[in-house]
Amino acid sequence: VIVSWFKKLVPGLVFAILFSALHFGLWALANRALPLINVKPAVNGFAYSGYRGNQSPLDGQHPSTAELAEDLDLMHKHTRHIRMYSSLDLNEVVPLAARRNMNVIAGAWIDTDNQKNTREISALLEKLENYSNIDRVIVGNEALLRNDLPVQSLMGYLDFVREHSNVPVSTAEPWHVWLKYPELVKHVDYIAVHLLPYHEGVPVEKAVQYTIERYNQLMQAYPRKKIVITEVGWPSRGPAIGASVASEVNQARFIREFLARNSIEDLDFYLMEAFDQPWKVALEGWAGAYWGMYNADRHQKYSLQGAVPPNTRWIAKATWSSLLAFIPLMLIAWRFKHWGIGGVLSMAVLFQACITTLTIAWNLPGDYYYTLRDFVVLIGLILGIALTSMVLMIYAAEFSEVMFKPAWRRLFKRAQAVPADQELFVSIHLACYNEPPEMVIATIDSLRHLNYTHYEVIVVDNNTKDEAKWKPLETYMATMPDNFHFYHLPSWPGFKAGALNFALDKTHPDAKVVGVVDADYVVTPDWLSDLVPHFQESQVAVVQAPQAHREWENHFFHRMCNWEFEGFFRIGMHHRHERNALIQHGTMTLIRRESLQTLGGWSEWCICEDTELGLRLLENNMELRYIDETFGRGLTPANFKALKSQRNRWAFGAMQILKHHMPKLLGKSSLNFSQRYHFLTGWFGWFGEALQLVFTIGSIGWTIAMLAFPKYFSLPVVVMIVPILCFLAIKAILGPVLYRKTMHCSWMDIFGASLASLGLSHAIARGIINGLTHKAGVFVVTNKTKAKLSNWQLIDPIKEELLILVSLIMAGAAMLYARGFSNLDAQLWVSMLALQSLPYWSALACQWISERK
């Protein structure tokens, strides 16, 4: 038995080894060490703050004497000079430095607190009396830059200290502050300047030259003053500022190039700084913590000799992501071997991409020093990666469950019809607005022929102004039996929800169940008889049948719409229904009247009142059932404009629901974990469309910037292309595979459904963004009848898509023209622009197909 199992697992084991090796190799390729200029490990001096990762002067947590001694021993390997910032803290440093023959620039921190300033200066002068290894003094650190005090006050402090000091005295400010206040130079013995080109948006390759130029500018302005660079350096982490990019490689490059240049210039300088200081994040933002040659744990971040890898922790990340995925990869290769190599590879790539993305996100706290304040900022930076990872994992979960689960646990069928005297009374509500009367009459006529005894039909026409649309309904309803009722509301608020609430008020007092159908649905006679008996179980609040369509077979656009809709009802609805997290729909739905009225009826503030009601019912511990059998068929949207309008409304309504229900989705409610998961993540695919729109507009803008300002804007291909490729891969691979698995349709129909889905990307993105930024929406009825359009009306539905498409084409052409067709970077960038254009080409194709005869 063991041998038999081993033989079965060998192919999967080999596949997992090869795939993991390839994955690790890609990590190695992306993180190959970069050669930099080699310099001697000698530094003129270090700016020094001795706080460690869990320490901060802001809350009174200071390093011990032993920790300070350890720091000085590390710095002693590189220098004999250090610079301090305050005389009230870390008092052991100066005597510890003296034992190691190290000189100290002592500092007095000056800010808005005059009493504290006095204590700082007193402590500074006391140290000057006691320790001979203090060779310079700095009173104030960027106090003028922060506007903590006027220049006259600072000059007063400087004059006082100079009178009581036997060593040179200065204050530390950036170069431009010294140029702004020439009078300040008369009150110092030397100029203590900060030269930090990162803060000025200078690219790292020009940063050293820029530093020397600013130094020379000060020399020319004040030729008789000695200049000491008391801060010079580059951070290893932080936000991009103009062309300045913070990274360990850039930090190593700047320091090495500066040290090499200093061998010629012979400058008096202090590197900013010896050790990373996480506590500075609270004062200075991200970059403030990451200026050290050593990290907060006292490990050197880079060497001054040899090549430097872009990411020193890549081996750990690659190893963990490979190890975490290894056994699942082996099981994928074994479990899905009947798919063939293509299926196995597609699953493996998807799963490894998920694990790798999550591993990178998980390791970000190890790359950054987290505090409560900067946690939100850091989350913002990794939002793109985290969102992509979550979307991938959500799709992976749905894909795996639908593809491989032998049977659905919650699979309900038609119920056994009950005798007439045991039937629950049903009130069927049909709301319509400005609909073709013949279409609505067909729906009413189908309701007349239901195989059910105890029911009524309430038709509510709200806000239709054209009598030719609602008068025929009134006339036809007058010929119906007494259980058919018609109401015309000339002016009624609340859109469809308002009409349904009106119908609810008019409902027969004996009704136990409320049914809702759209105005275009022709219902089968067995709808009520086969589904209403489910309400005999008291916990059942909703019985939902799928949306289905008719009259779609003879036009390719309607075929596209039909199969695009079918995907959700054959796949997504089952996936959610398995955990009682159903998306309720506003047609072919049956609701327990008591539950509906207890919750206050339909929500008129939401333009997706059906889904919102379903979530409220779930929040009240009720069960929603899905019967995947067709009991009625409606019409597909008449054209692409109508399809876009419908999907835009759904996306907008989804955001209304999320915003309104977020406290219960995240806080205290009766929703279980699975229900919260589905409603919080179920629309993440649509969030991806919004993110893709942002990326696309950003790419166009970035292309323009690269063409207009090539010295300051480079090609961020990897940053932009990864999320786009992920979303496109999901749609291009998972969708067709699931369609082929769950539905009986041709590859052409799968292509059509995929084309429609991709073409709707912009409409969904607009709906998501508008839903997030606006509170109220407008319920636009989906047009189901086609009319002849003018040439402008043919273009109008996709004018935004065309504008973006033309912009992408022009951006790509301009980039190739400017950089040359043989430029590899330009080719990659234009390839990314081409990928980003696919949704807009699809929208153009959908519009053309929808208007064909």
Ranges and model annotations:
Residues 40, 45, 51, 57-60, ...:
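Aromatic-rich peripheral "rim/lid" segments of glycoside hydrolase catalytic domains that contact
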